[in-house]
């Protein structure tokens, strides 16, 4: 069989794994790349390559070797200038090289949103040294949030509540940085009512949206998500307006995870990822088309006739608590048995080869067909608590 398309996937984590499954169901041939062998997406891909995405020569060599129809980034730390070179030669970078460059760096996408598009954001400043960060914190005020301009899954992110905490926050940010840009963004803390992810799909036929996803974070990383999340119709429309403005400015086709803070009637842009979002894993059970299906269809130019919600749904993460390369996952059978009637449960184990504290090793999914979002959240959390990692 001749594949419908060849995809070079740059980054092979759990989000990439689900994307590979969706793309292969549509006939694509996928080459999964990452810095270590046996990464989750590699286990289900057609081929695999192991190299650092920050090695420009190795990245170019992989592109030259496989000659993909689409280059699909799944991680933040990539030599984006190499992607721009190949896009200029006629290759398709998803969603576009410009979008990848802008969104892989928090400062650049913030400038697009705040300066170019005039969208509401928190007050912010940048710092490249400890002294600059002390000055930025003094000007922004405390409490404030410090994030590396390039990182993932909340790494390096912390809340500074007083001037005494600045030095430790700088060290933590530097330790959590990806890439080679030693720069942080210092944001005024917003006492928001809640935060959401609006999955926004840019297709050749226009922009479509999933229902807003609520989520809870710890240490800057998602712990649980749910869909739908209660919002006023006005707030939903404002989030859609902002999301469409940003993705249309970035261009290209694919799914974007657009994050917002909501405070009263105010909808405030936070961040954007040009790919499936971790909080969007709830769509594996909540929708007829998951975020991974939607990303694959948008990339391949396939139609998305409708996005249907099955009912109140939730996801909860399964985390490791120590470093190990020899471990087992127990309790999956117990996790799949609901404690209440009317609940559907599922589990995704990511098959990562090693653990470390707080590393995401799996996720539980719950659908409350005749219940509430709170019922789904409780079921997902209860299921996650039953899955245990046993270290040998």
At which residue positions do the language-model features occur?
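ATP-binding N-terminal substructure of ATP-dependent carboxylate-amine bond-forming enzymes
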Residues: 1-104, 131, 391
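Active-site nucleotide/adenylate-binding loops and adjacent lid/helix of ATP-dependent enzymes
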Residues: 9, 102-197, 201-246, 384
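Anion (oxyanion) recognition and catalysis
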Residues: 24, 87, 114, 138, ...
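Short acidic-glycine loop/turn motifs at beta-strand connectors
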Residues: 202-206, 218, 262-266, 368-370
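Protein kinase-like catalytic core scaffold
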Residues: 208, 256, 267-271
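Active-site "cap" helix and flanking loop/linker of ATP-utilizing ligase/carboxylase catalytic domains
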Residues: 237-258, 263, 273-325
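Peripheral (often C-terminal) accessory segments that flank ATP-dependent C-N-forming ligase machineries
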Residues: 297-392
């Amino acid at each position: 069989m001749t594949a419908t398309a060849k995809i070079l996937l740059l980054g092979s984590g759990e989000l990439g794994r689900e994307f590979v499954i969706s793309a292969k169901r549509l006939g694509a041939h996928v080459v999964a790349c990452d810095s270590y062998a046996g990464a989750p997406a590699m286990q289900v891909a057609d081929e695999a390559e192991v190299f650092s995405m920050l090695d420009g020569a190795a990245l170019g060599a992989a592109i030259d070797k496989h000659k993909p129809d689409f280059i699909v980034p799944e991680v933040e730390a990539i030599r984006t200038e190499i992607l721009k070179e190949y896009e200029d030669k006629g290759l398709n970078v998803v969603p576009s090289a410009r979008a990848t460059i802008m969104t892989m760096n928090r400062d650049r996408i913030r400038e697009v949103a705040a300066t170019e598009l005039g969208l509401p954001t928190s007050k912010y400043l940048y710092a490249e040294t400890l002294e600059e960060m002390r000055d930025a914190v003094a000007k922004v005020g405390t409490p404030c949030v410090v994030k590396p301009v390039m990182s993932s899954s909340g790494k390096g992110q912390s809340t500074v509540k007083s001037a005494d905490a600045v030095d430790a926050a700088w060290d933590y940010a530097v330790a959590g940085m990806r890439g080679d840009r030693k720069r942080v963004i210092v944001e005024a803390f917003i006492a928001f009512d809640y935060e959401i992810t609006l999955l926004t799909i840019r297709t050749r036929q226009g922009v479509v949206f999933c229902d807003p996803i609520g989520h809870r974070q710890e240490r800057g990383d998602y712990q649980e998500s749910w869909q739908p999340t209660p919002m006023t119709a006005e707030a939903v429309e404002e989030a859609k307006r902002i999301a469409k403005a940003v993705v249309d400015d970035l261009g290209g086709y694919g799914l974007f995870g657009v994050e917002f803070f909501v405070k009263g009637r105010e909808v405030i842009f936070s961040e954007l990822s040009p790919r499936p979002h971790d909080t969007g894993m709830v769509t594996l059970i909540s929708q007829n088309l998951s975020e991974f299906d939607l990303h694959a269809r948008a990339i391949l130019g396939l139609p998305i006739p409708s996005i249907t919600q099955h009912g109140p749904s939730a996801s909860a993460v399964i985390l490791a608590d120590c470093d190990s390369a020899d471990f087992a996952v127990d309790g999956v059978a117990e996790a799949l048995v609901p404690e209440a009637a009317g609940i559907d449960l599922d589990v995704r184990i990511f098959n990562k080869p090693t653990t470390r504290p707080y590393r995401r090793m799996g996720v539980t999914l719950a659908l409350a067909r005749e219940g509430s979002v709170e019922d789904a959240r409780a079921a997902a959390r209860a299921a996650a608590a039953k899955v245990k990692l046993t270290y040998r």
